[in-house]
Amino acid sequence: MTAAVPASGRTSRAHRLRGLAGVGLLATLAAMLATTVVAALARAAGVDFAVPAGGETIPIPGFAVVTGVFSVVGIVIAAALLLWSTRPAARWVWTAVALTAISLVAPLLCGGTAATVTALVGLHLVPAAVMIPALRWSLRAE
């Protein structure tokens, strides 16, 4: 009886994708928790998160949801880089830093108070500080 053995490159790639997904999901949960805690602390310190452009106040759970969604987008980008790039870790860092920088434009243009804008900028950087190194580490792991 013979067993089909997958090519080692395919097995290695599948193993690395599973590892990336696992690390990414754990990092997503950590980023969601960290962002929610920082948002709650900012709210407790008096930041109202009122955005005049939309006429709404951002609810604390909204930070967790948006962080989760965009963290999963980051995992998908990292997976694509793992599959199609010869240097996925380096490409991930460049891509993620560029996307983080672009994401800072919205808080700066939202028309909120200085405290709200500062808190929103910080709340963009918190999940980036969790996700970028975690996925970089996972992409570098052999």
Task: Say what each PLM segment does.
Residues 20, 72, 79-100:
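Internal alpha-helical transmembrane segments of multi-pass membrane proteins
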Residues 31-43, 71-79, 108, 128-133:
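Transmembrane alpha-helical segments of multi-pass membrane transport proteins and ion-pumping complexes
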Residues 1-18:
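Short, Lys/Arg-rich, polar N-terminal cytosolic tail immediately upstream
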Residues 93-104, 120-131:
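Hydrophobic alpha-helical segments of small multi-pass membrane proteins
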